[in-house]
C-alpha cells in the first residue's frame, strides 16, 4: 500500500513537472512571438512614417500618413501596451531622420499612444468586432481632442523657439487657405486654427487608419496570432 502510494505520488509529480515545463515553454513561445510581431509592426510603421502626403486644405507643413495603422493592428492582436510600444519604437526609429528636433516625433508618439491604448483597452474588455470598432473610434476621437492642447502648448511654441518662426507667420499659412478663419470662433488666432484645421484633420487621419485596419486585419490575423 505504501509502495502504491509512493508510486502514485511519483507519477503525479512527474505529470506536474511536465505540465509546468509545458506551461512555461508555451508562455515563452508566446512572448517571443509577441515581441517578434511587435518588432515587425514597428519597422513597418517607421517606413510608413516616411510615406506622407500634402493635403490641399491644410498648410504645407502638415502631412498625412498612415503610420498609426501598424500600432492599431498591434493593439488588437497583442494588447494595448504593445500598441503603445510600437508607437514609441516607430518614433525612435524616425528620430534620426526627422527635421523637427524631436518635436514632431514627440507629438506623434503622444497622439498615437493615446489612440492605440484606448482602442486596445476597450477591445480587451469587449473582444468582438463591435468592441474593436467602438474602441478604435473612441481612440481616434480622443486623439483628435488631445491634439488641441498638445499642439497649442507644446508643438507650435517649440517651433517658434527652435526655428524662430513668428506665430503670426504660422497663423498666416492657415489664413491663406480659408481667409480670416483665425478670427473665429474665439479671439485666439492659433487656437482657432487648431480648432478649425488640426482637430478635424487628426480625427479624419485616425478614421482612415481605422478603416484600413478593418480592411486588412482579417487577412493578416493568422500572422498576427500565429
Where are these regions (language model features)?
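Loop-helix junctions at membrane interfaces
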Residues: 2-226
